Design a protein with these regions (language model features):
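Cytochrome P450
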Residues: 1-433
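A short beta-loop-beta micro-motif enriched in histidine and acidic residues
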Residues: 38, 455, 475
């Protein structure tokens, strides 16, 4: 395909946002590093070139990570080293109080706090909640034979997974769901280039600050107490708001990466029966499927950086103050790294080399949780159903799908995803899942309990989807 990248505004073009593959492939073949002419942003699609940026946080600041192609600062960025001036004007950058926009040494101290909350031991303890919650939600959805997957399952699941990880009492879960459901301000990466200076995560700060202060006065020996008493690497006790921001950052990751990963994964499974059959025959392939999905459809397409000093990427020289956009979604299609990159291959040996979770000091700390959520959700869906399909009523027939995608140059995901399903008889899926030694039901009874609902049975907007009207504010965890 021939195109003129100088004629395409990657940040506002709705066609490219809906289907960026032709743009990605052309840029990889001709311009793996490209300075686009309208804003002067250096767009990096090449895998190795993106890795080079990730490896040098002393050169490339993350302060503009959740911003846009244009910097809105009251001062001109001039000089050979912008490190001090960027921190001086940090308040002018979106999500400036979030970990993803921090540079060392501030990033080092705060990330240490975060990693203390998501230890391997705590993730292991979280597994039972993930399994139990997946079944609880599927108990609600599968008997209907249809659902709007994003709002009725994925969003609730992603939020509650983080809530349990942080030790939020279950009686507070409905409050958190309601708190994170309301849209405030424009979406990050919107095609109108509107910048939101409202941080949706601030709604969580008061909640966690109150919990932290209470636990410091009266330790309870629970997870929240451990979080409240966590210290920086030098042994100092952080201000409660710093800990609250760290906790909120995990919710941001759930609201973005995990939510969209679940939607993208289910869309592919439901739309590609060959892949669905392959996974049903061997659910041990589900983790590989997830990595291949992340490679070819990164939920967070790109991440901004800002040069603090003079630098070069490939053969392109960059002055201090240059905005750089790393496109993870394109890097996953780099033929220098991934053979036949346009093919979806569940058995791909190096799929996990993708950059969907970033690299270096800003590697997504919630990646293990995101992977676990996707694995448990997909396995339980496959075990508890005989067939999952895209609702043709809502999304059109196969080959002519009308997806309801996020209108964003930064995110890849579904606003809504309507599915129909055939539920497996309870005794059959429990036996298949290995959760109990259960005899298979007689064939006639099994047929009676296995129900399929046509797409026509789907309402245009399910009651729960309507109750969740207004998309949640996209938060600050742009990978």
């Amino acid at each position: 395909m021939q195109l003129d990248p100088a004629e395409i505004d990657y940040f506002t073009d709705a066609v490219v946002a809906a289907d960026p593959v032709p743009y990605f492939d052309y840029m990889l073949a001709h311009h793996p590093v490209w300075r686009e002419p309208k804003y002067g942003v250096v767009i990096v699609t090449g895998y190795h070139e993106a890795l080079e940026v990730y490896r040098h946080p002393e050169v490339y600041s993350s302060i503009n990570r959740t911003g846009g192609p244009v910097l809105d600062l009251p001062v001109e960025l001039a000089g050979d080293d912008l490190t001090d001036i960027l921190e001086q004007y940090r308040a002018y950058f979106p999500s400036n109080d979030q970990l993803v926009t921090f540079d060392p040494p501030m990033h080092t101290d705060h990330r240490a706090l975060l990693m203390g909350l998501i230890t391997p031991k705590r993730l292991k303890e979280n597994e039972e909640f993930l399994k139990r919650t997946a079944d609880r939600f599927l108990d609600e959805l599968l008997p209907k034979g249809q659902c709007e997957f994003i709002w009725e399952y994925a969003k609730r699941y992603a939020i509650l997974a983080v809530a349990d990880l942080l030790g939020v009492p279950e009686e507070d879960h409905p409050m958190l769901l309601a708190l994170l459901a309301a849209e405030r301000g424009p979406m990050l990466g919107n095609l109108q280039l509107q910048v939101s200076h409202h941080n949706s995560l601030e709604r969580l700060y008061d909640y966690f600050i109150d919990k932290i202060e209470r636990r410091r006065k009266n330790p309870a020996g629970d997870i929240l107490t451990g979080m409240s008493l966590a210290t920086f690497p030098d042994g100092t006790l952080p201000d409660p708001v710093h800990v609250a921001r760290i906790a909120a950052n995990l919710f941001a990751a759930g609201n973005e990466t995990t939510l969209q990963l679940l939607g993208i994964s289910l869309a592919r499974i439901a739309d590609d029966q060959a892949v669905q059959d392959q996974l049903r025959q061997d659910t041990a392939l589900v983790p590989r499927f997830i990595e291949e999905t992340l490679r070819i459809e990164a939920p967070i397409r790109g991440s901004f950086r800002l040069t603090k000093v003079r630098a070069s990427i490939g053969e392109l020289d960059l002055a201090p103050g240059t905005v750089v956009l790393l496109l993870h979604g394109a890097a996953g299609r780099d033929a220098r790294v991934f053979a036949h990159p346009g093919e979806f291959d569940v058995q791909r040996a190096n799929a996990r080399h993708h950059l969907a979770f970033g690299r270096g000091i800003h590697t997504c700390p919630g990646a293990p949780l995101a992977r676990a959520e996707a694995v448990y959700s997909i396995r339980r869906l496959l075990e508890r159903t005989e067939r999952i399909e895209i609702s043709a009523e809502h999304h059109g027939p196969a080959g002519q799908r009308r997806w309801d995608l996020m209108p964003s140059y930064k995110f890849r995901g579904h606003n809504h995803l309507y599915l129909t399903c055939t539920e497996r008889a309870a005794g059959l899926w429990r036996a298949r899942a290995g959760r109990a030694v259960t005899r298979f039901l007689p064939r006639q009874r099994s047929r009676r309990r296995s129900r399929t609902w046509p797409a026509a049975a789907c309402s245009t907007s399910s009651p729960k989807a309507a109750a969740w009207s207004g998309r949640s504010a996209t938060s600050a965890a742009g990978r």
